[in-house]
């Protein structure tokens, strides 16, 4: 039989018995690790007290209500063994209370659907209202803790409402509170706590009312006051997205984020291509089914109708520009598939495509890759079934032609956007020459035909062309002589420089240092004849060669003198690029005279010609040689030479601007090259800049011996020339003034002492010789020589006075005391004339710098200076052949002489063409000014000046060295 069992704690009135039961249930039998610390043991004491409150007190209402403090003291008194700590219970409970405050709390702020009310709870042991919340357990995350605590306190599951990104977190009194924001909870839900004796009340509160009466009403709130501001902001944001459009966009964004779709959707090209191929295969299978006699279904017929409609639309679009299409690249491929639009033609290797039709180069806007080495010249065969059209060279300037390829149209694919096609202008090659990508002659002709001739001044000016084999340069030169034009300033510079340039006839011969003296005398005789027979047209041809952008310049031909003179025009540039880049800009600007291009452009062109002439042989240039010349003077080499020139020019401050400071002499120092052959050395250094050989690199340079020179002196001059890095520009000016006189004096009449003159003595002699009129006999020469001695001293005094006036500008300069003695003072006044002539200045050569140093005085003396300069011109010039022309340019004679000394780079001021005929000049234009008169005077000086046994050394003065020093300091 069984004994009926009664409830253990039912009708029990003894508190000790109840505590013994709870002691066995919650404390004695707990794991040892839970008794390892005071806090963990007190957690079990707390659970036992909750059990007493929740269950035993309900069964026996007469039992006393016990708090955790009194309940713990009773348990320890009943069983002291459970408390093994050396601490009092009340102190342990205080530590436990502090520990509980450090445990994080997770809860939820629950709003209704209208976001107007919030759900709050009130605890059984508290009189304040707060969010449903609870302490986080061991190894529990925030979301799970929030869901668990809310479900225990109000009985509502937040799993479908909670968002881990929307929460408010605060630290209050060292305790972390994290409240998740929940919206959309229905107010009709029956909230009921799941735990006993923990939650007393659950109510909805108006949020706006709470925010206004939080600190005024008697109702107490906990955590709400510290979180009111972020709650209000969150509600405002939630109300804004409540609108229908915003909700839709918000839902769409959330859906995209959920599906992993970004805002910028990337189209997969592989998938699109696969879909296109599937569509084409499906359409092909449908056509095969129809051709096999199978009756398609109604759906297939509808699909075919839609495709045919799309085909018609595409045909209409293509018919609008079909007339502008290029001929098919694949004529043999596209014709068999013209009737069947859905069949893709077989592929063809690219090599065969390029070999079968060379138009592929033109239609693909140039070569897509390197040309095939196995390509053969194609010839048109009219007997073939598909004749190959005329080859078209590549058009590099044409845009790409999308309609060039005759690929069959795949109508079942998605129709691409049709753009306006570009037509290619046909450029057929000659029929007798097969198309070949390796023909340098054809490529050079094509490039030369497209280059604009921007430097051509008149339509009659001949173009430079590359000579073919068998072509004589003499025939071309004779045709060009009648058509060339030349300005007066260029003719003047050519007349001054011609004796120097005429020494280059034997440039292609071996070094003359190994020749006897008789050979040297013969060479100089040929120089004199060449100077007398030179024409102005050759200077214009040289200017065309300098300004031309084409590279076919300077064909060296040995047999004739005219051909040698043509080659002489390029030799100075070759030497300038080989020896000294710094002197290149100055010597070239002096030698070649005025030009429209800037100094840097001139130097670049001269350097490019010099680089070209290094690799050129003295033979007729054919097609292949012309192609090599074209390759050797590319733009890259021009750019490199220009950079080297600019870097070298930067080393000296004014070396490209001031020709008189080339040797960098100190103030007051006189150039001291007084060796017995310094005159020849000075002249040969200037000649060396413009008369070196035009041969292949590493070939010895050619020197022309002067009369009286020895091989030993030439060797010394060569060493001195190699060691000198900067050529004296003042000696270049001396050479310009010396050449017209030295070329007219015969070798039998020249004194041997003239071979040993220094540069300063010769420039003084030149300035004195310019004031000598046309001599009639030796007596006039003697009287003129005495006058020149006085004029030289006056010239030195005037230049010294001008030097003082420059350094002290406040002191007045008086020229009246010198203005009435002789005509040489006109030249001195011109040298001091102020820069008020009206001629435009050109900053590109040494001549402009010399004119700047000569024109710095007051403009109040202009009338008297003009009178003196006119007298000087009348005194210097012989009577010309034609006195009928007048000065139309309204410029006085001082302007004209100053512009001639300046170099007169403004070519627009001179429009006359001067043709040299037997030493005399003919002026054919009415616009000729006084510079033409001076030009005629200088040209006629060869027949006008005849001074036998003239000793230059007798006219040298001690002040000439000081004159040259003053010129150097300027």
Curated annotation (Swiss-Prot):
One of its GO terms (molecular function) is 5'-(N(7)-methylguanosine 5'-triphospho)-[mRNA] hydrolase activity. Changing residue 945 to L: In strain: YJM627. Changing residue 567 to R: In strain: YJM269, YJM270, YJM326 and YJM1129. PROSITE patterns: NUDIX, NUDIX_BOX. Its main location: cytoplasm. Signal peptide: none annotated. Residues 528-539, 625-637 have a biased composition (Acidic residues). Its EC number is 3.6.1.62. Residues 577-590, 677-691, 848-863 have a biased composition (Polar residues). Residues 302-341, 417-465, 501-520, 528-692, 831-867 are annotated as: Disordered. SMART domains: DCP2 (SM01125). Belongs to the Nudix hydrolase family. DCP2 subfamily. Component of the decapping complex composed of DCP1 and DCP2. Interacts with mRNA, LSM2, LSM4 and LSM8. Interacts with EDC3. This is m7GpppN-mRNA hydrolase. It comes from Saccharomyces cerevisiae (strain ATCC 204508 / S288c) (Baker's yeast).
